[in-house]
């Protein structure tokens, strides 16, 4: 059986391709994007061929998997239909594969990629597990019992999963092109949580997780005292964070970790919660958490002399705030410069005021033109990066051509924040720093 993934360079699609390849299937893919993306490196390592033209080889034994970014009218999908091939959407195929294992899903507006990656790292080292992470990382073996996946709420895609544990890192309004309002989001998460076979594990510090309508047991983690699992005696330093964990007021263990920011404490508590219920030893869990190297494009650092470059996927105001605060914790004596690309016109319109507030937490903010993704400018008249830049305390527009504005900030920590890699800017600034 051969699988043909249309839109294979996407983070989720590329990870699914890796998993199908690991399980012994022939895998090829197609993508409109002819530029090199960070997801391609792992595909190349596995020998998975990527086509960017029509010279692919598909036949009656091919199953087609369509990325949600690929429309039904795309020529590759039209061709597949003309050949009467079976076509699955990404989440449908992932559900078919993952539901064969003891599934743990991680959902949430923020933190799900890091939490999934962190949980996979620990479980992989404590008995083995399969995993699919939204940073383009995927691995599977038929011998493993557990499967950890990042579950996306967009278009309610996470409803196809039947997890043992359903994790919710937080609930917030995002994907404003789909969800009608906050209640619609809460309803979607309630449906997702009620698919859990064992239990729901949710961040109880988040007010919206307390509003879920559930018929399954739920276990809350957080920093607030009214949670089932609580981090106490927290100390943040430039070396990381340490804290004690109590489960229903009983001491579980001490954790001293090289992580930065309150959000990382919460992400870690989600992982510890699963480990506790799987009866794993706290010291072993702590030892494996310590060796976590981070998820792709999540506070990914490059150090050149006294300048720190950070590549991060952050695009929602909550995520941008978390990255800036983590930077200040780790490098308290450095200027923090944010280079931000707004993602989609609908998000920019909905979150402009919040983005202004969080970007003002940086010492300097540069803003690129909006990345439209699937949207069109004509549908959002008057929505552009100027509506953010005009209200920043110390902000200005930047383009690939005006990258030299960054020269003034040699010696600072410079945060490149965007779901799409701001490659040209980073490369030009990196070349300058290496001269």
Give the residues covered by each predicted segment.
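Redox-cofactor binding/interface segments in oxidoreductases and associated redox assembly factors
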Residues: 64-67, 149-150, 168, 202, ...
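Adenine nucleotide phosphate-binding catalytic loops in nucleotide-utilizing enzymes
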Residues: 6, 41-43, 62, 67, ...
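Phosphate-binding loop of NTP-binding sites
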Residues: 19, 23, 72-200, 204-217, ...
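Short, basic phosphate-binding NTP loop
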Residues: 2-105, 120, 226, 230, ...
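Short acidic low-complexity segments
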Residues: 49-60, 136-139, 398-406
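Conserved acidic residues
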Residues: 61-63, 145-146, 164, 198, ...
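ATP-dependent carboxylate-amine ligase
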Residues: 1-35, 46-48, 64, 80, ...
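Short glycine/serine/threonine-rich phosphate/pyrophosphate-binding segments
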Residues: 12-16, 114-118, 265-268, 319-320
């Amino acid at each position: 059986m051969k699988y043909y993934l249309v839109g294979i360079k996407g983070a989720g699609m590329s990870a699914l391709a890796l998993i199908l390849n690991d399980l012994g299937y022939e895998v090829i893919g197609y993508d409109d994007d002819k530029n090199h993306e960070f997801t391609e490196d792992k595909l190349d390592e596995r020998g998975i061929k990527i086509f960017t033209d029509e010279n692919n080889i598909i036949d009656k034994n091919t199953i087609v998997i369509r990325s949600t970014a690929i429309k039904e009218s795309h020529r590759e999908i039209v061709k597949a239909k003309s050949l009467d091939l079976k076509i699955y959407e990404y989440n449908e195929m992932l559900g078919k594969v993952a539901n064969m294992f003891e599934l743990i899903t991680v959902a949430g507006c923020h933190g799900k990629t890091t939490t999934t990656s962190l949980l996979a790292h620990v479980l992989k080292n404590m008995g083995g597990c399969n995993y699919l992470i939204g940073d383009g990382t995927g691995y599977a073996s038929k011998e493993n019992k557990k499967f950890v996946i990042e579950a996306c709420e967009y278009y309610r895609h996470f409803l196809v999963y039947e997890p043992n544990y359903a994790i919710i890192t937080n609930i917030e309004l995002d994907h404003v092109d789909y969800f009608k309002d906050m209640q619609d989001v809460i309803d979607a998460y309630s449906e997702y949580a009620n698919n859990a076979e064992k239990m729901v594990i949710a961040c109880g510090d988040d007010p919206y997780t307390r509003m879920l309508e559930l018929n399954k047991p739920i276990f809350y983690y957080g920093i607030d005292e009214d949670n089932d699992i609580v981090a106490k005696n927290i100390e943040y330093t430039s070396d990381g964070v340490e804290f004690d964990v109590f489960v229903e007021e009983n001491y579980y263990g001490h954790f001293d970790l090289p992580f930065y920011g309150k959000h990382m404490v919460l992400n870690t508590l989600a992982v510890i919660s699963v480990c506790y219920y799987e009866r794993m030893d706290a010291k072993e869990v702590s030892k494996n958490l310590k060796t976590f190297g981070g998820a792709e494009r999540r506070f990914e650092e490059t150090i050149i002399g006294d300048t720190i470059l950070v590549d991060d996927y952050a695009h929602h105001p909550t995520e941008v705030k978390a990255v800036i605060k983590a930077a200040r914790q780790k490098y308290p004596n450095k200027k923090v410069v944010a280079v931000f690309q707004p993602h989609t016109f609908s998000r920019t319109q909905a979150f402009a005021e919040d983005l202004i507030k969080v970007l003002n937490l940086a010492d300097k903010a540069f803003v690129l033109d909006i990345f439209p993704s699937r949207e069109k400018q004509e549908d959002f008249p008057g929505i552009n990066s100027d509506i953010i830049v005009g209200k920043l305390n110390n902000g200005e527009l930047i383009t690939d051509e005006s990258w030299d504005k960054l020269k003034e900030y040699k010696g600072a920590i410079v945060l490149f924040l965007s779901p799409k890699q701001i490659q040209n800017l980073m490369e030009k600034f990196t070349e300058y720093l290496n001269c």
